[in-house]
Regions:
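Residue position in alpha-helical solenoids
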Residues: 62, 103-110
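N-terminal leader/linker segments that initiate helical-solenoid repeat arrays
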Residues: 6, 20-98, 113-114
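N-terminal secretory signal peptides that target proteins for export/translocation
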Residues: 1-7
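Bacterial N-terminal signal peptides
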Residues: 7-16
Length: 115
């Protein structure tokens, strides 16, 4: 009986320790993730994509893809806007298309039901 109690105690202790090491929705650097998500979102709401894009890029690098599906959707929208505005610069346009396809792939991997 004593061995069972000790085994249950150790199991409970190990399970409680794993939750301490979990990173949560916003990843290891959650403060910066939330900050950059907030910054880009405010500019995005105003359709000020030029000001929104640098903060979005920082959010995309800092946050895990599972932090916000809207981060991926908004990024796709901003990249499409850049593609339209830079139709004459073929090299830049190809790089933007590659970025857009990467965003779509990341979204399909993390949100397969919603694609």
């Amino acid at each position: 009986m004593k061995k069972i109690v000790v085994a249950l105690f150790i199991t409970g202790l190990m399970l409680s320790c794993t939750s301490v090491f979990a990173q949560g929705k916003y990843g290891a650097d959650s403060a910066n993730c939330i900050k950059y998500l907030s910054y880009y979102k405010e500019y995005y709401k105003q359709q000020n994509y030029k000001e929104s894009l640098p903060s979005w890029r920082k959010a995309y690098k800092t946050c895990p893809p599972t932090a916000s599906q809207n981060m991926l959707l908004d990024g796709s929208s901003m990249i499409r806007n850049l593609i339209e505005n830079n139709a004459k610069n073929e090299t830049y346009r190809k790089a933007l298309l590659d970025t857009l396809m990467t965003l779509h792939n990341v979204r399909m991997q993390n949100y397969p039901r919603l694609v």
